[in-house]
Amino acid sequence: MMAHEWSGLRYGAAYYNEYHQERITDEAGNELAARTEEDFRLMSEAGVTVIRVGESVWARWQPEPNRFDLDWLEPILDRAHANGIGVILGTPTYAVPRWVFIDHPSVIAHHATGAPVAYGHRQNVDYSSVEFRALCEPVITKIVERYASHPSIIGWQIDNEPGAYLLHNDGVFDSFKDSLRDEYGSIDGLNAAWGLTYWSHALRDFEDLWRPDGNTNPSYLLAWRKHQARLTKEFLQWQRDLVRKLIAPGQFITTCVAINRPGMDTFSIGESLDATSVNVYYASQDGLEHPTRQPSPGVAAPAPIWVPLTGASALNLICDTARGIKQENFLVTETNGSSISQGPAMAAFPHYPGQFKQAALNMVSRGAELVEYWHWHTLPYGVENYWGGILPHSLKPGRTYAQFAETAVALRAIESLGRLTPAAEVAIVYSTSSLWAFEFQGSLRQPNGMVDPKSYERTLQSLYEIAYSAGLGVRLIGETQLDLGDPVGFAAQHPALILHAYAASDELLEFARAYAAAGGRLILPPRTGYVRLDGVMRTEVAPAGFAAVLGASYNEYSNLNEPVAAFDV
């Protein structure tokens, strides 16, 4: 059961009226109010029931250190309420004002080299910094106190797409060393666990630890990524606790999750939230084919480079990942309105007729209770000026708006089905530790011979597509979400289990053996359990813990130069 208790499906778009407040007039020269009124008329006619606002404009809320401007949003919320539209209001901490960088240089995020991140982008701060949180607290508090009682507000988004980058500030590195002291107790314990005799890397003291910029040790890498994920989670929990004290009963707290951001553990982030909200961006046009057709060599997929997977199964996989974050239904706070291009990553692939509605219905079938597009207005400026919204640059309704309205009708037609719980005959263990390990030492290779950092996701989709093609539902469950004490119950619930865990604990491997002994059908992908959770290779005969049970083992493995059919289907 989700934290919110609304009935039916919700539908809408992110709405950034503030981006147009200095430029919008109609043909008669009227002010912004005319444009705003037209927007809400179009929203109401198209079936919008939710908008998301306010999360990207800290400088609009707080133009100067001691000056706040809070009233500009009220007319938008009033009009939303008058039209029966609920609002998710965001805290603006992911896009910081220039004055923060100038007045507080110590909060600027650092690259691995130690150089500060240049201004001009977003998510460019060290959010573990006490000083940064002290800057965040007043603007968060002012916004929430001002609008928590507004009748349009249904929920709050804290930050946005957290974990975008790895942080390398001195304070982050110091807290990393402290975490290693806590985990290993002594420097001898760390030296032994990580095998630091190799290449003369043994340390005299934790203060001797090298910076991550020069690291080549897999155990260091996994510990560093785990620490980054912990910092992201702590920042969200800090914001959640601050906001929780101020909001009205019945309002939920979420964040917009971009799955598998570098500084985040996707399957632990839900512990900080009342409800899961995600980006569901997918390849359109031929990128929604099934079975998945990989692009020809040298030809890019019909999606931005940061959408790593294509095919109809990839859309389902994203949704099942979203549902796995809290093992419950979820909200889609961003998805393709039209082409999704940003800066140098161009991907002008607007939907084929019918795909807009097809994708939305697909999301709902996998547990989405809100489908919200990014965004309402296509922007005339900024790096996302080619990111198509529901309305084009002209702000005149066109084909996308018509598809948007048509999809709302289709969703209303299935509201009577109630809260849908997707079927899941197959379970897949999702291992974030393995994702990180494969980014460094992946099982797959690129055409240039280098490791494919998307090895984990590509293998996951191949496994997922087998179930998808067979018409079987899939449940993704994080390695830390399993009840390792009840393999018998898990086998009764899930007839098949795919253990997609290159890095695995002894307890997880024992659970999988007990699951199979209880009658479950256990599937082991390549290199299952090959390393421990700390990245050190297991020395048992592979597959570790399963050779005797399977009656099969291996000592060698090979990359493939081209696909090879193992058997005919």
Question: Where do the protein language model's features map onto the residues?
Answer:
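Conserved, mostly hydrophobic/aromatic
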Residues: 13, 43, 51, 80, ...
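The substrate-binding groove and active-site-proximal loops of carbohydrate-active enzymes
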Residues: 11-32, 54-71, 118-137, 159-166, ...
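Aromatic-lined substrate-binding rim segments of carbohydrate-active enzymes
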Residues: 36-117, 141-144, 239-247, 359, ...
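Short, well-ordered coil/turn segments that N-cap beta-strands
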Residues: 6-11, 47-49, 81-87, 149-154, ...
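Polysaccharide-binding and catalytic clefts of secreted carbohydrate-active enzymes
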Residues: 103, 110-317, 321
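Short, acidic/polar
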Residues: 21-45, 136-142, 258-268, 351-362, ...
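Carbohydrate-binding surfaces of carbohydrate-active enzymes
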Residues: 284, 300-569
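N-terminal carbohydrate-binding accessory modules
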Residues: 1-50, 63, 78-86, 416-417
